[in-house]
């Protein structure tokens, strides 16, 4: 019965990542804690395995568009750190019951977000809370604090139901009040932004085969924006943003892409941030493609940011010599991408615009680095066409909303095929597109220079979590499973 309940708990937590279901994450974790309560290690291991496999099988099901083997492999990698949750006893009568499971989740999520190959920070409990009251705590302790408090609330819920604990109920009320008391930053300065969603000819991961199709779509949609500006229907933007891979032809190589973009930029009062794959070559450092954001003015390309956090098995192939013998589709990635160095911050008429590309928005440390480099507002250039009609675009948009609240920065998302949108620094969405349509996002975003506590001190929750576990688990760390 507990085995089935653990599977159900995993499904409930996966469901919590859908819009408006933030509370289900607390319920799912409470069910898991109930299943693990006072059970021996081997039983905890089996139940935690059932929970994590179910959770991630649902949550990252979208990766199956690349193949069921990719889906299976990712589920296993995401599940492995959760096995730490089974190492320490769960006892609802223990004085550490509220905090020890929370500390375990904080540590295992930190491991999963950074290992292996840079980690995969998807499916963190914190991201399920973007529509809930706990998300406000992200300004203090980032994703670690929010995830930890989700588990604390789950433990409190179990205490209230199992023991009719009045003190636990008061603690839950106290957490709610603390969450509600966190306020957003304000600014008198703002910037007018526009994002271009040109759309793609079809769903899938073979867009590169449709030479110039994506480029032409984004040229046409930008022409539409310029016409609306000229007619007075749309305010003049300070910056126009194309998505990742907004041009499927390298614009830094002289030719039709460079000519068309330069002609467009000459008629625009605002610079255009182009997303493109370009070729990097640097003698001793080697060469390869880069995933770049290129600031294009009427004088041509100027500032360039290249993606730092490359996607393993998407933009480069770890263990290529071994895996390529068994998985033939890695032939579609003949050259490993070259990572950029350092955050991307563009000066646009005095405004400091940070730029991140696609999955980079899920890496908290990279967003913090971008803000610490001076970013007052952040653009996200992304291409989610491969995962169209799955839950991936909505999940990534929710992560971006979380980042906006956590860092108190407005985020402009430009996607080739959706979802694009303008997210204010309080997480509210002032413009949002549907998938697989040509669309324009416009709006005003505040320019904020003040930094949240979590941005200035990003690791304090994790450090306390590790120290707490070392202190409370000295007698419980196993040399082997019983």
Where are these regions (language model features)?
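Soluble catalytic domains of enzymes that build or remodel membrane lipids, polysaccharides, and related
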Residues: 184-457
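Membrane-embedded alpha-helical bundles of multi-pass enzymes
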Residues: 1-182, 389, 400-403, 415-417, ...
């Amino acid at each position: 019965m507990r085995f089935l309940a653990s599977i159900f708990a995993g499904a409930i937590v996966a469901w919590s990542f859908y819009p408006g279901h933030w509370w289900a994450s607390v319920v799912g974790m409470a069910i898991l804690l109930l299943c693990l309560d006072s059970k021996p290690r081997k039983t905890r291991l089996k139940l935690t395995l059932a929970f994590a496999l179910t959770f991630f099988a649902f949550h990252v099901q979208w990766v199956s568009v690349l193949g069921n083997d990719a889906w299976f492999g990712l589920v296993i990698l995401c599940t492995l750190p959760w096995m730490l949750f089974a190492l320490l006893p769960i006892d609802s009568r223990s004085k550490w019951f509220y905090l020890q499971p929370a500390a375990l989740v904080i540590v295992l999520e930190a491991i999963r977000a950074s290992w292996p190959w840079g980690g995969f920070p998807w499916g963190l409990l914190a991201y399920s809370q973007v529509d809930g009251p706990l998300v406000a705590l992200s300004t203090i302790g980032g994703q670690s604090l929010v995830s930890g408090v989700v588990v604390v609330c789950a433990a409190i819920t179990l205490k209230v139901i199992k023991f009719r604990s009045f003190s636990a109920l008061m603690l839950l009320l106290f957490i709610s009040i603390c969450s509600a008391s966190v306020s957003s930053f304000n600014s008198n300065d703002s910037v007018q932004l526009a994002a271009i969603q040109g759309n793609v000819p079809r769903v899938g991961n073979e867009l590169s085969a449709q030479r110039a199709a994506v480029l032409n779509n984004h040229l046409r949609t930008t022409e539409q924006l310029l016409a609306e500006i000229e007619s007075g229907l749309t305010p003049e933007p300070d910056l126009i943003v194309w998505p990742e891979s907004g041009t499927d032809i390298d614009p830094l190589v002289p030719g039709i892409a460079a000519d068309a973009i330069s002609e467009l930029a000459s008629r625009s009062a605002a610079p255009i941030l182009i997303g493109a794959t370009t070729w990097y070559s640097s003698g001793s450092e080697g060469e390869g493609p880069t995933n770049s954001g290129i600031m294009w003015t009427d004088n041509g390309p100027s500032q360039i940011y290249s993606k730092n956090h490359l996607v393993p098995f998407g933009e480069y192939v770890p263990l290529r010599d071994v895996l390529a013998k068994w998985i033939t589709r890695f032939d579609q990635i003949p050259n490993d991408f070259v990572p950029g160095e350092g955050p991307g911050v563009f000066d646009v008429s005095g405004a400091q615009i940070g730029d991140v590309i696609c999955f980079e928005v899920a890496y908290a440390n990279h967003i913090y680095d971008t803000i610490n480099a001076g970013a007052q507002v952040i653009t996200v250039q992304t291409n989610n066409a491969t995962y169209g009609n799955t839950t991936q675009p909505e999940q990534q948009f929710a992560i971006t909303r979380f980042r906006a609240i956590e860092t108190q920065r407005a985020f402009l998302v430009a996607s080739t095929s959706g979802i694009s949108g303008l997210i204010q620094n309080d997480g509210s969405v002032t413009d949002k597109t549907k998938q697989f349509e040509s669309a324009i996002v416009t709006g005003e975003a505040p320019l904020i220079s003040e930094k949240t506590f979590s941005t200035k001190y990003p690791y304090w929750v994790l450090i306390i979590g590790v120290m707490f576990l070392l202190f409370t688990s000295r007698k419980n760390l196993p040399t082997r499973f019983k």
